[in-house]
Swiss-Prot record:
Keywords annotated in UniProt: ATP-binding, Isoprene biosynthesis, Kinase, Nucleotide-binding, Transferase
Binding locations of ATP: 92-102
Pathway as given in its UniProt record: Isoprenoid biosynthesis; isopentenyl diphosphate biosynthesis via DXP pathway; isopentenyl diphosphate from 1-deoxy-D-xylulose 5-phosphate: step 3/6
UniProt key word Metal-binding: no
HAMAP family: IspE
Protein name, as recorded: 4-diphosphocytidyl-2-C-methyl-D-erythritol kinase
One of the record's GO molecular function terms: ATP binding
Length: 287
């Protein structure tokens, strides 16, 4: 039996960093949003563990969240099963788009089905939380208000948004960005509540005005290109532009599709990754 799953990326429409926890993580408040950029993963029963990927820089050990999810399930349920996994990578690495977390979420769903585990929703959420902070969101997808370290999720009614994603030639360590935040003395902008109110009204201009990311302040200080991309997107007609996650990907929100397409063509030769995307209401899709 073979299973193919689309694992969708996410953007942070807001990200408030509230405090550092005793366990080393940070308390956050964030509106997380699934987008239609996706990796595709094939899973097949096997006697041994085989992992293939069409991107040579994807790690194959425990630092790969697919393998972390695989081992978490095997260890939790004392299993000795093998698996063959093929990953077709479309979400850029270390980009703030939760590509690794989305792949891990797909792995949890796939192993549940292939190994007939009949996991409850609560069990899946526990495994997801153990694997990574963004994995619980990627398991559910859509539009969510995330709190705790990102694993506590509350449903929100989303709004269709047209986005242009731009990733400069950088790969940024999430851990390093949070360390820089801790050392910066910055306080959270606390933008999430205003954003949620705008979302409830369905007012696109107010939504765009309240898109914000605390971590952008430390990342853009170190990497000027973040501000350059934001400025360029605004000049080309975006209602707003913001970094997602710990970066370095920046997205612009457009309400004029012609301007969006023009901006895509203008920027695609300038930066290594530029993609048109839109918001969706799911994190995973079985093909």
């Amino acid at each position: 039996m073979k299973l193919r799953i689309k694992a969708y990326a996410k953007v942070n429409l807001t990200l408030d960093v509230l405090s550092k926890r005793e366990d080393g993580y940070h308390e956050i408040l964030s509106v997380m949003q699934s987008i239609d950029l996706a990796d595709v993963i094939e899973f097949e029963k096997a006697k041994e563990i085989l992992f293939e990927c069409d991107h040579e820089r994807v790690p194959k050990g425990e630092e790969n969240l697919i393998m972390k999810a695989f081992n978490a399930i095997r260890d939790r349920y004392f299993l000795n099963e093998g698996i063959k996994i093929k990953l077709f990578k479309n979400i850029p690495l270390a980009a703030g788009l939760a590509g690794g977390s989305a792949d891990a979420a797909a792995t949890i769903v796939a192993l549940d089905k292939l190994w007939n585990l009949n996991l409850t929703e609560k069990e899946m959420e526990e495994i997801a939380s153990e694997v990574g902070s963004d994995v619980p969101f990627c398991l559910k997808g859509g539009t969510k208000l995330a709190s705790g370290r990102g694993e506590k999720l509350q449903d929100l009614e989303g709004i269709p948004l047209n986005l242009l994603l731009v990733k400069p030639d950088l790969e940024i360590s999430t851990k390093e960005v949070y360390t820089e935040w801790d050392n910066s003395g910055f306080k959270s902008l606390n933008s999430t509540f205003l954003f949620v109110e705008a979302l409830k009204k369905g007012d696109l201009l107010e939504i765009a005005r309240n898109i914000s990311n605390d971590l952008e302040r430390v990342t853009s200080q170190k990497y000027r290109v973040i501000e350059d991309i934001k400025k360029s997107l605004i000049e080309k007609g975006a209602l707003s532009a913001s970094m997602t996650g710990s970066g370095p990907t920046v997205y612009g929100v457009f309400n004029d599709v012609e301007k969006l397409v023009r901006a895509y063509h203008d920027l695609k030769g300038v930066y290594p990754f530029v993609a048109i995307s839109k918001t969706i209401d799911k994190g995973l899709e079985i093909l």
